[in-house]
């Protein structure tokens, strides 16, 4: 058996590509074997068929490429190829033979215009029309690739969203199942007599709770810190309310003392004199007299305010008045905190019911105490009366 390409087959293919007319004519070879017009590929002949004289010599390489291009064109069946057919090889051996156009490399991926360019030397040997066609095809391939990338990106984003939603659903279902299993197991817990087993079980339950809380979605636990924040703020304000109230009270007391210093006083001295050590101690009688002086009638205050002495008051005098009022306030606080001396003196004196005399505790403790020195109240009164008459 001899595998040879049929010359009539090549002529029929070239005739069908060059003209859009009907099928090629069917003739018989010299050997008597009919050449079928619908057959493709190689013809299997038992005997070697002679080549006709009229047909030009065609190489095997051109035959294989033309049969491959013809089959690919029939598979695609695109309208662009029928309207604008690409240049094909001519049958005449004497005419110029143009190179074939490259086929799409990624046709299986849905890319119709992604062609592989030939070498630079081959492109330079082509005409300007062919070069422009290559350029247009390459631009269309780039646009097609960009569209494909945008479609793939949209598909990727959609897949990521679906994956995130599916994860949330799975986490919720797992949380429900774990919580249901935990409640069921807690109802039917075995009461073991060994405390070690109980401790191990409690630690396992704690670890399960921690894993569930960490695996759960963070969106569920967002409102929890919002609820805890008001509690912490309320505790903070409750702790600060006491010192703030104390400061406010002290401020109000200072303000009252400052207002008292602005009210005209009874003393006629324009320049305040420095206070002695005796005056620094404020007794209840002095504080009462000071309050009585403050509560003066309106006529007296108006007359005092209209006096030129008050009008010509210096800032230094005001400062001294304010300082004196503050010192008086400090003395009042000290008096309220310390016990009065009169009560201590009263506690030291004792009253004798037998003779009606008062005896001091210090004198009783003294060793030189004599009972004759004590006098009764009637004798003391009579002696005082006699002294008054003599005078």
Curated annotation (Swiss-Prot):
Keyword Cytoplasm (UniProt): yes
Composition-biased stretches (Polar residues): 182-194, 265-286, 354-367
Main localization category: cytoplasm
Protein known as: Topoisomerase I damage affected protein 11
Sequence ranges of Basic residues compositional bias: 59-77
Cell location: Cytoplasm
Amino acid composition bias (Low complexity), ranges on this chain: 14-31, 48-58, 302-312
A Gene Ontology cellular-component term: cytoplasm
Keywords, sorted A to Z: Cytoplasm
């Amino acid at each position: 058996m001899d595998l040879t390409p049929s010359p009539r087959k090549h002529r029929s293919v070239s005739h069908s590509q060059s003209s859009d007319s009907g099928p090629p004519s069917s003739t018989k070879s010299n050997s008597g074997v009919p050449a079928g017009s619908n057959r493709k590929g190689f013809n299997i002949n038992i005997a070697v068929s002679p080549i006709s004289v009229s047909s030009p010599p065609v190489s095997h390489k051109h035959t294989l490429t033309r049969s491959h291009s013809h089959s690919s064109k029939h598979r695609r069946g695109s309208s662009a190829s029928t309207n604008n057919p690409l240049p094909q090889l001519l049958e005449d051996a004497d005419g110029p033979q143009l190179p074939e156009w490259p086929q799409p490399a990624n046709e299986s991926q849905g890319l119709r215009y992604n062609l592989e360019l030939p070498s630079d030397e081959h492109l330079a040997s082509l005409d300007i029309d062919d070069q422009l066609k290559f350029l247009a095809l390459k631009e269309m391939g780039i646009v097609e690739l960009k569209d494909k990338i945008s479609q793939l990106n949209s598909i990727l984003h959609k897949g990521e969203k679906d994956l995130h939603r599916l994860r949330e659903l799975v986490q919720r279902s797992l949380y429900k199942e774990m919580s249901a299993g935990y409640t069921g197991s807690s109802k039917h817990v075995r009461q073991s007599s060994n405390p070690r087993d109980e401790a191990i079980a409690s630690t396992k339950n704690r670890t399960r709770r921690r894993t569930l809380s960490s695996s759960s979605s963070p969106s569920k636990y967002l409102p929890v810190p919002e609820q805890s924040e008001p509690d912490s703020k309320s505790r903070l304000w409750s702790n600060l309310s006491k010192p703030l109230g104390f400061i406010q009270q002290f401020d109000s007391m200072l303000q009252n003392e400052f207002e008292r210093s602005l009210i005209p006083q009874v003393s006629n001295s324009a320049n305040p004199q420095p206070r002695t050590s005796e005056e620094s101690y404020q007794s209840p009688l002095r504080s009462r007299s000071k309050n009585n002086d403050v509560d003066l009638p309106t006529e007296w205050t108006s007359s005092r305010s209209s006096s030129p002495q008050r009008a010509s008051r210096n800032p230094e005098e005001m400062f001294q008045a304010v300082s004196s009022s503050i010192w008086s306030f400090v003395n009042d606080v000290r008096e309220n905190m310390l016990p009065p001396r009169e009560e201590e003196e009263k506690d030291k004196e004792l009253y004798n019911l037998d003779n009606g005399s008062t005896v001091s505790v210090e004198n009783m403790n003294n060793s030189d105490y004599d009972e004759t020195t004590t006098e009764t109240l009637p004798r003391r009164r009579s002696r005082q009366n006699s002294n008054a008459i003599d005078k």
